[in-house]
Amino acid sequence: MIITSLLDTDLYKFTMMQVVLHHFPAANVEYRFRCRTPGVDLVPYIDEIRDEVRGLCSLRFTDIELDYLRRMRFIKSDFVDFLALFHLNEKYISITPSPKGNGEIDIVIEGPWLHTILFEIPVLAIVNEVYFRNTQREPDYREGRERLREKIKLLGAKPEFADCKIADYGTRRRFSKVWHEEVALTLRDGLGPQFAGTSNVFYAMKHELTPLGTMAHEYLQACQALGPRLRDSQTYGFEMWAKEYRGDLGIALSDVYGMDAFLNDFDMYFCKLFDGARHDSGDPFEWGERMLRHYEANRCDPRTKVLVFSDALDIPKVMQLYERFRNRCKLAFGVGTNLTNDLGYVPLQIVIKMVRCNGQPVAKLSDSPGKSMCDDRAYLAYLRQVFGIAQPVDDDASQ
């Protein structure tokens, strides 16, 4: 069985789930799977994927896992008590061949947000591992280890990068569970203090690493349906987050509606309240410069704020960003696929995104148009109008 612990997921799933329990327990949502890599035939592996998901739905949190979560300063006791009773229910997920007949598969997750939020990361990890164990029956781990050593060597070679730290954000697109663990341990041993930690809660617990994460796009997307007014949905999301965490976990995600809309909403109050912001699409250098100017315009010293970069990073790009912004702000870097799925094979570009909440379409209009995903073009047009966002030339939202 690929997934053997419900902690084998990203920390931000639990931080968002706690907000859902306390503020949106009645919300119903729908997620859909998409493979952005052309020409990939997943249909032959559909039974294996279903079997693995069935195994996932048999898991419960152990007392050791619950105690670990309880010790986190921002996790509340009633949430842990809820998790003690929790398991994923197979009735909320369907996995079928796409009617297009092109090798794609349809994965639909539909049900109460509180009971479906933990599906996304392990299901993506399952699809990845099932695909690669069938297509690469003798993985070239030697090549993977050599590539990983070169990355560690590159980052650790120059003294001026001694304070440049990276984190593992690679659970969802990892080559395999075994390889992911080896990567995390190799980074810990090879980078020392330059390895900030991991988004994976299971490996953080098992190997005493720092678990990292705050919020994901789905949280702010759901607020489109849960907030009082669509135009205020991003502000509403930030306010509800602050109401739950009272200044903790203060990294705001910036690209659900694009950078312009984010800066319009992220006013002086939020600049002072939140610790920083996370970049996940668009030009990271331009984004960073705009964030620093925005902080200065709102009477905040940028050197006290954190800029988190997490969009398709590799080590050379991390180093370039560090050189640009060092000493101007605090920095954090989350590296995903380039760490956990770089053995010389083409990684799958797969996602599971929320598309509806309480029966209403929800969408992400990021700074990288190809990352947008919504099944309702009329709603997308309305959302753009509300937030004053131009129609991108290469919009692929209906694909």
UniProtKB/Swiss-Prot annotation:
User: Residues where Phosphohistidine occurs?
Assistant: H217
Q: Return the broad EC class.
A: ligase
Q: Which CDD domains match?
A: PncB_like
Source domain of life is: Bacteria
Q: Is Coiled coil among this UniProt entry's keywords? A: no
Modification after translation = Transiently phosphorylated on a His residue during the reaction cycle. Phosphorylation strongly increases the affinity for substrates and increases the rate of nicotinate D-ribonucleotide production. Dephosphorylation regenerates the low-affinity form of the enzyme, leading to product release.
Annotated GO MF terms: nicotinate phosphoribosyltransferase activity
Which InterPro entries is this protein grouped with?
A: N/Namide_PRibTrfase (IPR041525), NAPRTase_N (IPR040727), Nic_PRibTrfase (IPR006406), Nic_PRibTrfase-Fam (IPR007229), Nicotinate_pribotase-like_C (IPR036068)
In short, the EC number is 6.3.4.21
Q: Which GO terms describe its cellular component?
A: cytosol
Keywords from UniProt, A to Z, are: Ligase, Phosphoprotein, Pyridine nucleotide biosynthesis
Pathway connected to this protein: Cofactor biosynthesis; NAD(+) biosynthesis; nicotinate D-ribonucleotide from nicotinate: step 1/1
Gene3D superfamilies from the entry? nicotinate phosphoribosyltransferase
Q: Biological process GO terms, please?
A: NAD biosynthetic process via the salvage pathway
Can you state which reaction this protein catalyses?
nicotinate + 5-phospho-alpha-D-ribose 1-diphosphate + ATP + H2O = nicotinate beta-D-ribonucleotide + ADP + phosphate + diphosphate
**Which SUPFAM superfamilies does this entry report, sorted A to Z?**
Nicotinate/Quinolinate PRTase C-terminal domain-like, Nicotinate/Quinolinate PRTase N-terminal domain-like
Described by its record, this protein's role is as follows: Catalyzes the synthesis of beta-nicotinate D-ribonucleotide from nicotinate and 5-phospho-D-ribose 1-phosphate at the expense of ATP.
Under PANTHER family, the record lists: NICOTINATE PHOSPHORIBOSYLTRANSFERASE
> What is the similarity comment for this entry?
Belongs to the NAPRTase family.
HAMAP family linked to this entry: NAPRTase (MF_00570)
Instruction: Please state what the protein is called.
Output: Nicotinate phosphoribosyltransferase
